[in-house]
A protein has these predicted regions:
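Hydrophobic alpha-helical segments within soluble ligand-binding/sensing domains
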Residues: 167-192, 210, 214, 231-241, ...
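Short beta-strand segments enriched in small/hydrophobic residues
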Residues: 64-81, 181, 189-196
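Short beta-strand elements in bilobed, periplasmic/extracellular small-molecule ligand-binding domains
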Residues: 99-110, 210-232
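Short, solvent-exposed amphipathic alpha-helices that sit
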Residues: 86-101, 174-178, 200-219, 260, ...
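N-terminal helix-turn-helix DNA-binding module of bacterial transcription factors
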Residues: 1-70, 338
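Flexible loop/turn connectors
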Residues: 236-338
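Alpha-helical recognition/docking segments in bacterial nutrient-uptake
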Residues: 1-9, 71-180, 238-245
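An alpha-beta-alpha
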Residues: 178-218, 323-338
Length: 338
């Protein structure tokens, strides 16, 4: 057994108690501090064992434990379609799964124009131990505030600041691979439809598309690029321009845009892939089950959320945070590009 840090009949440590009872250290800490979401039965069992073994918490450790909330703040984009997005739904599931396994709770806050006020309130009132930011932006008030307040956080997305803990899918290579496949299949004129330019992933996907075009000898300037396509009422005008230019394939940066594109084409009697091919840089169940099913990139956003949460908990518990392993992806060719 390890070094004794407390006095008692057997010199039990917090880790020893957790091991004896088959729970983790966070659960024992919650029982001692009286904070956190524990059942009355679990709390009573832990406190009874502590009384029997004569455990007395170290004063410094107890003081630190009182400051812990075992709450993780999760910053979600404040947009109407956020829960329609397969990425955010699956990522949220992964975060909550790992948080629950370690006896942490998740408090969700929306990343909107009031984000500084909302996040500052959580920080100032000591409601959270750390934060997971669910998107990386070119200009991010969330990251700026977290750096200023020195609250531990993990960013899901890319960052040029090597001091920031972050993890992301390999969007650059994946988008390049899918675009290469389209070009290898004979596509020469494409329209790329993307979302908010303030999101870093938009620029990464554009770069992957551009690199595939250039290395294949296609003139990137001849491809149609439409960014900031964030509303349903924009789709019709963009697709009208694309069809007028003789575009052979419409490439959508995410599943939300792609669902809107497929619905518009279907409503207007434009057959896929006979009149125009369609592909997406992000897959979802809706695209897989569409008629026809859509060629897409499949990422494991659930695993991304799991790994981000493990990184944050390791940081909060003083463990070494290792370089994260990037989850794999798949290029899935379906009927929409045949």
């Amino acid at each position: 057994m390890g070094a004794r840090t407390v006095e008692g009949k057997k010199g039990y440590t917090l880790s020893d108690i957790a091991k004896e009872l088959g729970v983790n250290k966070a659960t024992v800490s919650k029982a001692i501090s009286g904070k956190g979401n524990l059942s009355a039965e679990t709390r009573a069992r832990i406190l009874e064992f502590i009384d029997e073994c004569g455990y007395r918490p170290n004063a410094v450790a107890q003081s630190l434990a009182r400051c812990r909330t075992y709450n993780i703040g999760l910053m979600m984009p404040d947009q109407a379609d956020v829960f329609d997005s397969a990425f955010f739904r699956d990522c949220l599931r992964g975060v909550c799964q790992v948080a629950g396994e370690h006896n942490y709770d998740v408090l969700m806050a929306m990343d909107n124009e009031s984000v500084n006020e909302n996040l500052s309130r959580l920080i100032d009132n000591r409601k959270i131990d750390g934060v997971i930011a669910m998107r990386s932006q070119v200009k991010s008030p969330v990251v700026t505030l977290l750096k200023q307040t020195q609250v531990p956080f993990v960013l899901i997305g890319t960052s040029s600041d090597q001091k920031i803990l972050h993890i992301d899918n390999d969007n650059l290579r994946a988008c390049r691979d899918l675009t290469r496949m389209l070009i290898a299949g004979g596509v020469r004129k494409m329209a790329l439809l993307g979302g908010d330019e303030n999101n870093c992933v938009t620029h990464i996907r554009l770069r992957g598309f551009r690199e595939a075009c250039e290395e294949s000898g296609l003139n990137f300037q001849e491809q149609m690029i439409a960014l900031n396509v964030t509303r349903k009422n924009q789709i019709g005008d963009v697709l009208q321009q694309a069809m007028a230019r003789g575009v052979e394939c419409i490439v959508c940066m995410d599943d939300y845009i792609c669902n809107l594109v497929m619905a518009h084409l279907r409503t207007n009697g434009i057959s896929v892939p006979q009149k125009v091919k369609v592909a997406s840089f992000y897959d979802s169940v809706l695209l897989e089950n569409n008629i026809p099913p859509v060629t897409s990139l499949r990422f494991d956003a659930g695993e991304l959320g799991c790994r981000a949460c493990r990184m944050l908990i390791d940081r909060l518990e003083g463990k070494q945070v290792l370089e994260p392993e990037i989850p794999p992806y798949q290029v899935i060719a379906r009927e929409s590009t045949k």
